[in-house]
Regions:
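Phosphate-binding loop of NTP-binding sites
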Residues: 1-133, 146-159
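Adenine nucleotide phosphate-binding catalytic loops in nucleotide-utilizing enzymes
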Residues: 89-93, 131-195
Length: 195
């Protein structure tokens, strides 16, 4: 596994992994962290362990999750589960079970799309480190312990101090326009919230 103290932020899902991991790496570096994107993009996981990075944004495929046993991510997310790769996994249930492994042993935050009951169930059934929280992503106004969108702002009601009464503006939807054009898709907004 990784050297002690270097957090892994793990991302899986049928669609959006590469985009989300790329954004996550940019956010971490903008915040001053020496971050590396690893997995299917960037550096292979096996080589990343030897790098000097302080934190890893890790893209994990269902194939990698099927064989991964020793990862304890600081935070993890399954963006979505669509029925692809069934030829390899054998069934939609087996595929979803492999994707669900991203949440195993998560230390701080199990992030999931609030509108996706299948992924929410993965979080509920995961064997996590005591104290890990479930954090939902909403494309509208977020409930407590969610991130969401209010009046064109991506907002946090999960990690702010008084989350029952306050939300923290993280970014403006227009911040995504350089990459996604003036009207980012729901998928782009969801990936940005995930990152």
């Amino acid at each position: 596994g990784p050297r002690a103290g270097r957090p892994w932020l793990c991302v899986t899902g049928t669609n959006g992994k590469t985009t989300t991991v790329g954004m996550l790496g940019e956010i971490l570096r903008a915040g001053g962290a020496d971050a590396a994107e690893v997995g299917n993009i960037g550096t292979p996981i096996t080589r990343a362990i030897d790098s000097a990075a302080e934190v890893f944004a890790v893209e994990l495929s269902s194939f990698q999750l099927h064989t991964a046993h020793s990862v304890s991510p600081l935070a993890s997310i399954c963006l979505n589960v669509d029925a692809d790769h069934l030829d390899w996994h054998g069934s939609a249930e087996a595929y979803a079970a492999d994707k669900a492994r991203v949440y195993q042993n998560t230390v701080r935050a199990c992030v999931y799309p609030a509108s996706d009951r299948r992924v929410e169930a993965m979080v509920e059934n995961a064997d996590v480190v005591e104290g890990a929280r479930a954090i939902g992503l909403a494309l509208g106004a977020p409930l407590v312990s969610q991130l969401g969108i209010v009046e064109g702002l991506l907002v946090d009601r999960a990690f702010v101090e008084d989350r029952a009464h306050h939300a923290l503006a993280l970014a403006h939807v227009s911040d995504l326009s350089a990459v996604y054009g003036p009207h980012p898709s729901a998928a782009a907004l969801s990936d940005a919230l995930a990152a």
